[in-house]
Every structure is written in structure tokens, then in C-alpha cells.
Amino acid sequence: MAMPTVFSTSSRMLALSRHSLLSPLLSVTSFRCFYRGDSPADSQKDLIEIPLPPWQERTDESIETKRARLLYESRKRGMLENCILLSLFAKEHLQHMTEKQLNLYDRLINEPSNDWDIYYWATEAKPAPEVFENEVMALLRDFAKNKNKEQRLRAPDLEYLFEKPR
């Protein structure tokens, strides 16, 4: 009969030690509040802004080189929303743009330091600065409205570049 007593004593000790190990963790995590996004009192003192070199228009490249560069830069944005929006826009409009329009598009996608700004301007969530209010921005805004209700889930394949012109 001593056996069950020893067994129950050791199991109680094991249960106690397990409880004492877990209880501090449970008490700490149950009272923590986690926030997502900015809080109203955020001073943003910990925010580091890396200065980018100012955008300069490239005057020494051919139209075809500029189109190829802008196609690449439209596809490789660093944020999925702009990769999809700008690469599909480039597929539809880049080949038909004049040199002036290419320069405006170049400035639009390369001068702003924050890609979210471009997205917000294109979707009309925020007003664009006056310098970007031009015919290319109007084309981009119209394209972003997706009036034809196309499915835009990813950037287009590059096979269209190798098709013969119609």
C-alpha cells in the first residue's frame, strides 16, 4: 500500500513542477496586448529614412532602351500591388507611348521615394502632387479602375514581347 502513496506523491510533485514552470508564461502572455499598425501616440522616433539619390532624367538612351528599362522597372517594384498594376499597365500602354509620355512615366515611377505613394495616387486614395498630374497619370488612373473587370492576380508573362506585331 505504500506504493500508491509514493506514486501519487511523485505525480503531484510532477504536476506542481509543470504548473509552476508554465504559470509565469501563461500569466505574462495572457495580459499582453499586441497592436497592428501605428498607434496615435507613435512619435516615429525609431523610424529611419534612408535618403535616395535624386531622380535624374536619362537623356542619353534610345527610345527602345527606355521602353525596355521602363518595362523592367514596372515589373520589379518591391511591392506586389505595384508589380501587378504597373506591369499590366506597361504591357498595355508602353509600346504606344510617345517619347514625352515615356519621360513622364519614367518620372512617375522613379522619382517618388515611396512606392505606396504611386499606388495611392493611381487608385485615387490620395491626391497626387501637381508635378505628377499629367496625361500618363490619367491613363494609369483609368487603367487602375479596371473598367473591363479583368482578372489581375499577377504580372503578365513576358511571351507577348516575342509575338509578331499585328
From Swiss-Prot:
Subunit annotation: Interacts with SDHA within the SDH catalytic dimer.
Pfam families xref list: Sdh5
Chief localization: mitochondrion
An example Gene Ontology CC term for this record: mitochondrion
Compartments reported by the entry: Mitochondrion matrix
PANTHER family named among the record's database cross-references: PROTEIN EMI5 HOMOLOG, MITOCHONDRIAL, SUCCINATE DEHYDROGENASE ASSEMBLY FACTOR 2, MITOCHONDRIAL
Name of the protein this chain belongs to: Succinate dehydrogenase assembly factor 2, mitochondrial
UniProt transit peptide range: 1-29
Keywords, sorted A to Z: Chaperone, Mitochondrion, Transit peptide
Similarity comment: family membership: Belongs to the SDHAF2 family.
Function as written in the Swiss-Prot or TrEMBL entry: Plays an essential role in the assembly of succinate dehydrogenase (SDH), an enzyme complex (also referred to as respiratory complex II) that is a component of both the tricarboxylic acid (TCA) cycle and the mitochondrial electron transport chain, and which couples the oxidation of succinate to fumarate with the reduction of ubiquinone (coenzyme Q) to ubiquinol. Required for flavinylation (covalent attachment of FAD) of the flavoprotein subunit SDHA of the SDH catalytic dimer.
Organism of provenance: Pongo abelii
Annotated Gene3D superfamilies: Flavinator of succinate dehydrogenase
Biological processes annotated in GO: mitochondrial electron transport, succinate to ubiquinone; mitochondrial respiratory chain complex II assembly; protein-FAD linkage; tricarboxylic acid cycle
